[in-house]
Amino acid sequence: MPEPGPRMNGFSLGELCWLFCCPPCPSRIAAKLAFLPPEPTYTVLAPEQRAPAPAATPAPAPAAQPAPAEEGAGPGACSLHLSERADWQYSQRELDAVEVFFSRTARDNRLGCMFVRCAPSSRYTLLFSHGNAVDLGQMCSFYIGLGSRINCNIFSYDYSGYGVSSGKPSEKNLYADIDAAWQALRTRYGVSPENIILYGQSIGTVPTVDLASRYECAAVILHSPLMSGLRVAFPDTRKTYCFDAFPSIDKISKVTSPVLVIHGTEDEVIDFSHGLAMYERCPRAVEPLWVEGAGHNDIELYAQYLERLKQFISHELPNS
């Protein structure tokens, strides 16, 4: 970032030049603000590429790029291979409950998808949009632990340019990615909208709010949401400019499903004020969870996180 200079509408001239002139298009602005894809921590192999993995430990990721599996193949047709950086914490039995496959987005990107069957008898499935610096390999253990504790299956996907998904991260791709994930969950697994809970974390709240503003579902969970990209980078921003990225604050009023907002009061990345503002704009907001003292990446470590999720899903949503 440039050194601060004279300010115009809350921005220094140096900040404006760096953000909007190099080059001046919303997709590049969004990329500067949001996307930090890690080196992939997993591969997805088609049946003919599989190699036997040791029981109870993930297989190392092959160096060669895997060929894409057929998108129409049935569940279990592909296999997940995790690298050491994936931090796998479970046995081979749990790994066998994870199904991986590819879908295709409207922008013609190959989308890596994951279905974690944590609670086969559960009514609800979370469509989980993860944060900006992880991929499915790193999130896999968390999904198993979370789903088993809140009694939900979990469907997730990697954004374009993350993990095994093709393309590059962009705002337009975010929206196309979650659309493809939504359709895959509905058609491949037969999950109806009234049984889908949209869960977005950090940058994942952006596609979550966009989808929820267009489709009704069982519920929406916004974990450390942001109002818009500029409001994160420049907290003095009071309105949405035409060049702003991720304008969730302008979409949240169109969400007709129940919305649970979760935010840490000491969030050092997306200020707590973002969660408050999103909560206040929700037409059907339920009691929020403000985690006292929590930052951006540690809310899950607080006991009230799981307690509030269980209360919301098991007692505040229909379960018959």
From Swiss-Prot:
It is an enzyme of class 3 (hydrolase). It comes from the Eukaryota. GO terms for molecular function: palmitoyl-(protein) hydrolase activity. Expressed in brain (at protein level). The keyword Cell membrane applies. It catalyses: S-hexadecanoyl-L-cysteinyl-[protein] + H2O = L-cysteinyl-[protein] + hexadecanoate + H(+). It comes from Rattus norvegicus. Hydrolyzes fatty acids from S-acylated cysteine residues in proteins. Has depalmitoylating activity towards DLG4/PSD95. SUPFAM superfamilies: alpha/beta-Hydrolases. The keyword Disulfide bond does not apply. Residues 55-65 have a biased composition (Pro residues). Signal peptide: none annotated. This is Alpha/beta hydrolase domain-containing protein 17C.
